[in-house]
Amino acid sequence: ERTLIPAIIPPGTAHPNGVFCVGGADNRILTACAGFASSLLLDFSARAAPKSGIYQAVFDRLPAPCQRHPLLPALLLRTLRLNCLTDAYADLWAECFDPSFTSDSWTIPDRATTPLGDVGPTWTSQTPLRRAVDRRQALVEIDALVALMLGITADQLCTVYRTQFAVLYGYDHDQYFYDAHGRLVPNQVLKVRRKKGEAITEAERTATTYRYDLPFHTYDRELDMHIAYVEFERRLETRGTDS
């Protein structure tokens, strides 16, 4: 599904040699690079040449974000809300917090369950995105942001997704179903739903301690990336007009 799988690790943690890590003095740059690395375009760049692992030589040739780009705060907010899952990231959140975060919003407002800009300078348990549909939307918008920042068109981005990420494309259309509350529906529930359709019972829609409420949806990643790209392009043009 993916080759380049980034994560921001907090201070005091360790990892085996199979994981390559980078660091630096400026955590805003580190966070921006993590956001870039989570995009489909950088994953495509990383897998372009045969390799047994992802080490410095691979990472060094990947494109990096411009630290003066007007869309950088949007990239930082989505990356931070995806990665800052516990209070171990509280210092990172405080250091990277930008007042513009509070005026940011999703490109598809009625899709996510959590307002994007509903954050403050201090990390709380409400800071990270935890619901599956919210995390998916943040990744889709990061894909659009990175493409726009690199001068890649929305059509080119969608072509990369459709032709180079066949497994993800298949999951998006056949496996990744979200319930009415934005939770990812587990396979054991989907198997029954495929047989019985909307006639699936409440007991059959219950797994572990969760009841997954109908209707179940898949989402069109290509359409969502197009919408996000056009909206970020509009915001960028508006910012240029206002400045």
Feature locations, PLM:
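S-adenosyl-L-methionine
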Residues: E1-S243
